[in-house]
């Protein structure tokens, strides 16, 4: 902990909660607190809210789930929005959401450390400029996708072409006619491969492990919506069996195209490991036609391309790493107790992962997307509000006792 005098640290007590992160999770937490009359200071390291969506997502991205499953508490999406809003529409929704709730984040505020001070019963949040904010409650809302996850492949520095993470990828337009290797077969890897194909590139996609691919819609309805409805009445295993049977009827045997399915069903696997099934938006047809080539795991990179684990070598102009993101919580949060793993993932399973000790809360670490974010935000706001209200009662009692003594 910083031992400088308070005046050098520019120590400031702030009312209510400090929320770290101004993405969907942080905005939802702040809005739900504001609705209950609890103030919050929202800290955001970038220059805008929803910065990951605004700056790190590719142009063709749209929500994979229908908008009714992705809206945040207190404000639905505009009726004129399509079923699957685009990236730009989602960012506009976030802007409107913050404005409607009166949430004004402090931009350019990077948290270097947050630690609980037992002596005063509050959290000390130190910013990169030296300022220290003191608050009774700390809400961690930086999310599970704060930093790009970039694997260190052997020979990576040798590659003479362009290598980038999907956080830098915007459109396949610049890759027309080029051979591109996409490393990763999750939703991002699948969509980037599709985008490259539609812009005239020659993509190959690395599929290292088994993967569940489901149609985004079944029988004219959202696959996710069908699954959620069935789970109200049926056990996970039966719902998984239904989804896989329907997927086989609609998509065929994906295994014959290099997309082998795990033995565990898609929902059960998601619950156990956090691995999300791919919702196909057209990529599979291009794999079947051969326009997108499925390849195995990468052993190392070479000057002209890569060497695969089966010993084969292939040349590529560009390598795009669709290897996901990671949490940055371990780099700045101290005294997290039993709430986070060393990798910054919640130790506590949903729906009880939102509350820690000493006034520590989290929003958006459920591995359940925006639905989990909304659930967390509502729970956090309710819990903090109860304590905030109790504090007001205590203050009134003290005032009444003081007045009665005269």
UniProtKB/Swiss-Prot annotation:
It comes from the Eukaryota. It is an enzyme of class 1 (oxidoreductase). Its EC number is 1.14.13.168. Expressed in coleoptile tips, root tips, leaf blade tips, shoot apical meristem, vasculature of stems and flowers. FAD binds at residues 21-26. Keywords: FAD, Flavoprotein, Monooxygenase, NADP, Oxidoreductase. Transmembrane segments: none annotated. One of its GO terms (biological process) is regulation of root development. InterPro entries: Auxin_biosynth/cation_transpt (IPR050982), FAD/NAD-bd_sf (IPR036188), Flavin_mOase-like (IPR020946). NADP(+) binds at residues 184-189. It catalyses: indole-3-pyruvate + NADPH + O2 + H(+) = (indol-3-yl)acetate + CO2 + NADP(+) + H2O. One of its GO terms (molecular function) is indole-3-pyruvate monooxygenase activity. Its cofactor is FAD. Involved in auxin biosynthesis. Converts the indole-3-pyruvic acid (IPA) produced by the TAA family to indole-3-acetic acid (IAA). Functions downstream of TAR2 in auxin biosynthesis. Functions upstream of WOX11, a transcription factor that promotes the development of crown roots. Calli overexpressing YUCCA1 exhibit high levels of auxin, low regeneration frequency, overgrowing roots, and abnormal root morphology. Plants silencing YUCCA1 exhibit severe dwarfism, inhibition of shoot elongation and root formation and elongation. Belongs to the FMO family. This is Indole-3-pyruvate monooxygenase YUCCA1. The lineage of its organism: Eukaryota, Viridiplantae, Streptophyta, Embryophyta, Tracheophyta. The gene is YUCCA1.
């Amino acid at each position: 902990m910083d031992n400088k005098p308070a005046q050098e640290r520019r120590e400031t007590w702030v009312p209510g909660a400090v929320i770290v992160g101004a993405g969907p999770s942080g905005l939802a937490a702040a809005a739900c607190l504001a609705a209950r009359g609890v103030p919050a200071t929202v800290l955001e390291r970038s220059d805008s809210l929803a910065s990951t969506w605004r700056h790190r997502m590719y142009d063709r991205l749209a929500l994979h789930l229908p908008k009714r499953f992705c809206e945040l508490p207190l404000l639905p999406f505009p009726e004129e929005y399509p079923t699957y809003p685009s990236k730009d529409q989602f960012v506009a929704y976030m802007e409107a959401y913050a404005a409607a709730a009166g949430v004004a984040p402090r931009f350019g505020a990077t948290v270097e450390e947050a630690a609980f001070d037992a002596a005063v019963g509050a959290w000390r949040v130190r910013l990169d400029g030296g300022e220290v904010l003191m608050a009774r409650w700390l809400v961690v809302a930086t999310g599970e996708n704060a930093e790009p996850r970039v694997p260190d492949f052997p020979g990576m520095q040798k590659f003479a072409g362009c290598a980038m993470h999907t956080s830098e990828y915007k459109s396949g337009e610049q890759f027309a006619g080029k051979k591109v290797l996409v490393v990763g077969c999750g939703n991002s890897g699948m969509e980037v491969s599709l985008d490259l194909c539609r812009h005239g590139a020659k993509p190959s996609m690395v599929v290292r492990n088994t993967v569940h691919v489901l149609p985004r819609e079944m029988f004219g309805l959202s696959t996710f919506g069908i699954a959620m409805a069935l789970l109200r009445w049926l056990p996970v295993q039966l719902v998984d069996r239904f989804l896989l049977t329907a997927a086989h009827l609609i998509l065929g045997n994906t295994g014959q195209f290099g997309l082998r399915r795990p033995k565990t069903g898609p929902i059960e696997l998601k619950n156990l490991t956090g691995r999300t099934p791919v919702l196909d938006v057209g990529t599979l047809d291009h794999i079947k036609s051969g326009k997108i080539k499925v390849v195995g795991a990468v052993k190392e990179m070479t000057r002209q391309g890569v060497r695969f684990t089966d010993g084969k070598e292939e040349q590529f102009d560009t390598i795009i790493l669709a290897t996901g993101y990671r949490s940055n919580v371990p780099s700045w949060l101290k005294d997290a107790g039993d709430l986070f793993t060393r990798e910054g993932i919640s130790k506590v399973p949903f729906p009880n992962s939102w509350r820690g000790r000493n006034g520590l809360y989290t929003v958006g670490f459920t591995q359940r997307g925006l639905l989990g974010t909304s659930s967390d935000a509502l729970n956090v706001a309710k819990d903090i509000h109860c304590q905030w209200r109790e504090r007001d009662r205590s203050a009134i009692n003290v005032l009444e006792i003081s007045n009665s003594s005269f």
